[in-house]
Amino acid sequence: MNRHLLASWLIGAALLGAAGCKPAAVPEEFPQAAADGWLAAFNSGDAEGLALMYSQQSEVLPPDEPIVSGAARIEQFWRDYQPGQVRLEISDVEVSKLGDYWYREGNYTALVQDEGMPRIGKFIELWVLEGSAWQLYRHMWSPNSPPPAEMPPVAPAG
């Protein structure tokens, strides 16, 4: 068999095989609109709107406090927290798809009314699709505490 005929057969077989392949899936994007909705509800002080952003099995893990779970408790947590008194800005955000969840982490700056210095920290979120809405499944944040300027002396053992 001559080379040209063999090459034609190989190209034809490759094209025929490729014709039966499924097109490449379009990569799913992070549900940014949901995250933007949470931030808008927080900055406007809408505790009820914040509570609606969490899934049925959601847990909020605030710093220095017990885990908060259940829709009523999450809403009460945000009412007590008084969002809207704090202007939250986020930065350095990274997202990644983990199975059925979207993972998002980044830094935040909290601008508190009547305080001169912003509070800076980091956050982690897991988002899950419930019905047709992306909702928070886990939500955790913590402030970046500055290290002490000087360590106290250690008392001698004895």
Annotated model-derived regions:
Residues 8-18:
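Bacterial N-terminal signal peptides
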Residues 75-117:
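Surface-exposed, charged secondary-structure patches
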Residues 19-56, 72, 148-158:
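Short, low-complexity N-terminal intrinsically disordered segments enriched in polar/charged residues
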Residues 1-5:
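Positively charged n-region of N-terminal signal peptides that target proteins for export
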Residues 53, 58-68, 80-84:
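A short gly/proline-enriched turn/hairpin at secondary-structure junctions
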Residues 54, 64, 94, 107-108, ...:
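A mature extracytoplasmic/lumenal domain signature
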Residues 22-24, 120-147:
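Short beta-strand edge/turn micro-motifs at domain boundaries
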